[in-house]
Amino acid sequence: MKLGFYLLGGDFMRLAIIDYDRCQPKKCSMECMKYCPGVRMGEKTIEIDENTGKPVISEVLCSGCGICVKRCPFKAISIIGLPEELSEDKIVHSYGQNRFKLFGLVIPRDGVVGIIGQNGIGKSTVLRILAGELIPNLGKHDKEPNYDDVIKYFRGTELQEYFEKLKNKGVKAIHKVQYVDILPKVVKGKVGDLLKKVDEKGKFDEVVEKLELKNILDRELSQLSGGELQRVAIAAAYLRNGDIYFFDEPSSWLDIRQRFNAARLIRELNKVVVVEHDLIVLDYLSDYIHIMYGVPSAYGIVSMPKSVRVGINEYLYGELREENIRFRKEPIIFEKRAVIDFKNRPILLSYSSMKKTLGDFKLEVSGGTIYKGEVIGILGPNGIGKTTFVKLLAGVIKPDEGEVIKEGDIKVSYKPQYITPDYDGTVEDLLSSITNIHTSYYKSEIINPLQLEKLLDREVRELSGGELQRVAIAACLSRDADIYLLDEPSAFLDVEQRLRVSKVIRRIADEKEAGMFVVDHDILFQDYISDRFIVFSGEPGKFGVGSSPMNKRDGANKFLKEMQITFRRDPETGRPRANKEGSQRDIMQKEKGEYYYVDE
């Protein structure tokens, strides 16, 4: 079994990667050059770029000693060894010397091809190349990239014909981009007018109904929420006639019902490539899977195409069996948790039936209790009152009727749904203001699993959405509290980050005997962490009704019945899988009233 990376020395290609956002030559003594053995012997292993004033490392002259990695005060340098089969002539695209490199490409085909991988591994780059927005440079920076070289490179493969069509404008590609929040900056107008303008199929009314867009047709794009923008972007892509469609993270901002509505619509298209971090949605959507692995921001490798079940399972195991490559040291396995009778444990918090009116929205919640060490997952559509309920528990707002009863001096820690980077200082400053972060326990339980080591010296205001989310989760869980309230902790996180966060939440609940309320739309995430469910139903934006905490099976069954989605559990990994609508298993489970998973 070959280890895909984490190697130094030997007969293989070496990558020297510099994070130029972290590199600050004006604030250091150029330790990378000062201590480099090659430079000290008079070689040009590291030189200063005249334009940027920042170092450039020669991957040919670099010996791979790793001294610059250890000496750099800003942790900006990585030296990574690759297996010899990943030689320089296997590079499909490079963003420059000492920058990200992509090996391999996804093969478009009829049906839906899904791509799974960490953030920063090159998934969006693959989509841009296949959509004709970026001509791959094959790792050559000394001349402008052109399709003739690309066609020659892929000669004899399925991609040769595809790039020939791209060159001759013979492929009409429709691309739904990842960051839909930028759309109001480049497109102006009302939703209905914009969708009618791009409708080339005469399916405007059908799409409006399927994606539940009727109530926002008269609104300006600039007035829409993230979830509304996402649905409009998906609708606009679907309504256009194309030879191939690309969807980059279509489930972001959407609730569970909206995710499956979008997935059903996307599956109607003939040829699709989709990037998605919600494993259940990806499984439901796709006919084939490509795994992308490597080192984020350094290099990414595209696997051969695989069947959906095999592809997702191999990703979770961290092992490509046909290629005989292991790319992750530890597999991700969803152990079945024993059902615990929490009623034998002390009560942390209880609440009576509560009512709250906010403007035109009315919320009613049945009473309930949370016990020590219990995690309660909160399920329901957007705009149904889940966040309002969490705010009632946190004491951020008061109920109009009813009360929250804390048993003794109970402390509550709350991570809100929408996080604003309004802290002046570094991540280390923020976390240190809450607790002592320089202990071995904190490093092993929070810093390492949430991958915060390289963020500690970063300014909070400069963090991306996913980075800010991980810091906010760490801040919430670092507080000395008895109950933790987390609103959509999986938002902006990739597959592996979501699974790490779920394990951190579960471990803290078990070890500290803390109570947890978790709102999230990722069913796999909720299935892993939760002991019981609270289910919200109603009419979004008008009224919401929250149940009392229910056992996991009954709660999930109630929720999925409302969604008209059935689940089974994969026998190999234990992960929940959504049945394809209308399949034999889907029909059988609906007839039995068993919407939650059954074993295969």
UniProtKB/Swiss-Prot annotation:
Molecular-function annotations in GO: ATP binding; ATP hydrolysis activity; ATPase-coupled transmembrane transporter activity; oxidoreductase activity
Residue ranges of the region described as Disordered: 569-600
Signal peptide segment: none
Compositional bias annotation for Basic and acidic residues: 569-594
Xref: CDD domains: ABC_RNaseL_inhibitor_domain1, ABC_RNaseL_inhibitor_domain2
GO cellular component: ATP-binding cassette (ABC) transporter complex
Nucleotide-binding found in the keyword field: yes
Positions of ATP 2 binding: 380-387
InterPro entries listed in its UniProt record: 4Fe4S_Fe-S-bd, 4Fe4S_Fe_S_CS, AAA+_ATPase, ABC_transporter-like_ATP-bd, ABC_transporter-like_CS, P-loop_NTPase, RLI1, RLI_dom_1
Alphabetic keyword roster: ATP-binding, Nucleotide-binding, Repeat, Transport
Similarity section: Belongs to the ABC transporter superfamily.
Protein name: Uncharacterized ABC transporter ATP-binding protein MJ0719
